[in-house]
Each structure stands twice: as structure tokens, then as C-alpha cells.
Amino acid sequence: MTTEENTILKEDQQKLILQEIENNFKEMSKNSPSELKELIKDSLDKFNTITQDSEKEQFSDKIGVLNTIINITSDRINKNRNINEKTKKYMSEIKYSMYKLNTLENKPSFVKKSYHNGKYEGDYINGKREGKGIYIYDSGDKYEGEYKNDLKDGYGIYEFNNGDIYEGNYKEGLFNGKGIYKYFDGDIYEGEYKNDLRDGQGTYMYINGNKYEGQWKEGKKHGKGTYIYDDGSKYIGQYKRGKKEGKGEFICFDGDKYVGDYKNDHREGKGVFYYADGDKYEGDFKNDNFEGKGKYTYSNGNVYEGEFLNDKFHGKGTFYYVDGDKYIGDWKNDVKDGKGIYYYNSGNRYEGHFKDDHGEGKGVFYYKNGDRHEGNFHEGKPVGVHTKYYSDGRVEKVDSSTFKI
């Protein structure tokens, strides 16, 4: 049945019920005590005024007024002590007719209706989509589900013309509540929505095997979450506006692990990096790299404490060797470079310049017994003639090839 046919049928039924009410008003007026006739006549006049124009787009608004007229009339009649049985009977029939009119007005009709951007087929009440229906858009999109007050509301399935599919809850025309969104490329989101955006708790499964499970806000990862990569690596921690930010833990597939601060999707701030081989770094991070002050502990017991740049010892730092040796000084790109002091476990020490991890250029070598010699060094070894200062005060020029370091 078409929309027009449904409308005509409904209007015919409305007219019949309105006629019933009018007839009962007239009969009630004839058979009521004289003191009620004026009241009944006044109510009938108001009733007729309201119902003279009962076009479909206006009639639903008149129902409330008609209900008010009937209820007021009924209350005033019932308060009259001289009311007779016939008056009661006709008033009861008027109220029943009004009940039928209300029921008819709220009863959904099945319609087929065209809109500016598509066609609707389904339940229709008071000139609005209400109940279950199907809407096929001119663009090729399709919605099948529940409507309320002319908007998608309740459970529904929306098929997009690009192949995406949403299946879940709606509120006031938008994704709201729990739903599943299947993307044409294979990605799937299952979780909570708010005003068309992922919001709340949800799981996003990527076609490449990655998966995120956690909190969302305004369509982006936000709050606590777990991201599992297809290679087995895993991040557990905080997100902000779609990126890792705050405290987090990253466990790499090869056994490495990071625990610490994140900013803008990168390791940044304070943190600890554990290597699978037993090495460990504690300190500052920037853009995923060791940068700033930190401590690197090797699995063999060696320890470096100092400044880092781009994952390397760079700046001022101290290196403690497991055998008791120690270096304090400048570093560049992971090697001793600049001024420094190297302490040997024997009690001797070297003070001077370093390059490429070795003493280079001017330097002084101090012996445990108080002697020292000054001169040039190359690749950590004395070269040329050195001046040797003895602990007893003697000074002499000595060929450096005779020195043992």
C-alpha cells in the first residue's frame, strides 16, 4: 500500500471517530439535566472548531487540544450532583472514541516515501519515520534499522557505497553506543561510539595483523590501551589524541623492553631500556633515543654514567670497567674524545687528550709511586722524548720507548 493510500485510510477512520464523538455530544446534550446543557454545548462548539480543519500535517497537533476539552468536560460533568445515567453513558462513549482516536494517531503505518536524497520504506507515525524501516540513498548507501522521531535511533545496519558496513546502535541519527564497523579494506572496529566517533572502550583490528584494545575519545586512541603488533611486539600504556603519551611499556618481539615516558608517539622523558642480552640503560630519552643524562650497564659489569646523544656516549661521562679501571672525561660518538683521565686498577693514571678511544697528543702519565712523565701520546702509547719527573725531585729527558704503561 502506498503512502497516499495509507493516509487516505487513516483520514477516513479519523473522520468516522470524530463523527461518533460529535453524535454522542449531541445525544448527551438532549438527555442531560438543564444545568449541564450549556456546558455540553460549549464543549461541542470548541470540539467542532478544532476539528473543522483536520488536514494530516495539522491534525496530530490538534489531538492534545481535543484530549484537554474532553477531560475538562468529563471532570465538570462528574462533579454535578444531578448527573443521570444517560449523561454518564454518552460521556463514557465519547472518552472511548477519543481513546480510539489516540490509538489510531499513534499506530504506525507502512509507507513508501521519497525524500530529497533517497527513498524510505517502513513504519511511519504522525508524518515521521518511526519504528523499523529501510532507507536507500541516491548515493548507493543503505540503512536498515530502527527510527525514532524521523531519525535513525536504536539498532541498525548502514552499508556505505564504498563497501564499509556499520552494525550497531544509533541515537538521534548518529552512531551512539556499541557497534561494529567493518572497513572495505579489512580493518574492523568493535566497541563504543559517541556522536559518530569511536569513544569509550573498543578494539581495532588491522588487516595487517596489528590490534589495539583500549580507550578512545573523539575518534582517537586516548587513555589506557594495549597495542599488539603483527610481529608479536606489544605496547601497554597511555595514549593521548591517537599517540602514545604518558607512562608506557613496550615489549619487543626480540626480548628487548622499554618502561618509561612517551610523548608524541616516541620514547621521551625518563625511562629504562632492558636489552635481551642483559644490558640496561636508565635515563633520559628524546625522540626514541638515549639523549641527556643516563646510565648504561653492560651485562659483563661495565658501567657508563654521563651524557648521551643519539644513543651514544657523548659529552661528559665516566666509564667504570669491571676490572677496576675507570675513565672520567669527554666522549664523542661512543668513544673517548677530548680531555680526560684514565685510572688504571694498578694505581697508575693518564691525564690528557684522547681521540678515537685512546690517549692522543699532549698528556701526563702518573705512576703509583709518585713518578710521572709528560709528552706526546699516539693511540694510547707514549711517543718521542718525554720529560720524566721522579718522586725524589730528579728530572730527566727519557726516550718514551723505554716506558711501560
Residue positions per predicted region:
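Serine/threonine-rich, low-complexity intrinsically disordered segments
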Residues: 4-5, 9, 23, 42, ...
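Long, low-complexity or tandemly repetitive, helically biased scaffold regions used
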Residues: 4-95
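Intrinsically disordered, low-complexity PEST-like regions enriched in Ser/Thr and acidic residues
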Residues: 92-118
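Conserved anchor residues at repeat-unit boundaries in beta-strand-based tandem repeats, strongest
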Residues: 99-103, 119-130, 142-153, 165-176, ...
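Acidic/polar residues in short coil/turn loops that connect beta-strands
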Residues: 116-117, 126, 139, 162, ...
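Residue-level structural signal for beta-strand termini and adjacent loop
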Residues: 135, 148, 181, 227, ...
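Short, surface-exposed secondary-structure junctions/capping segments
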Residues: 368, 387-396
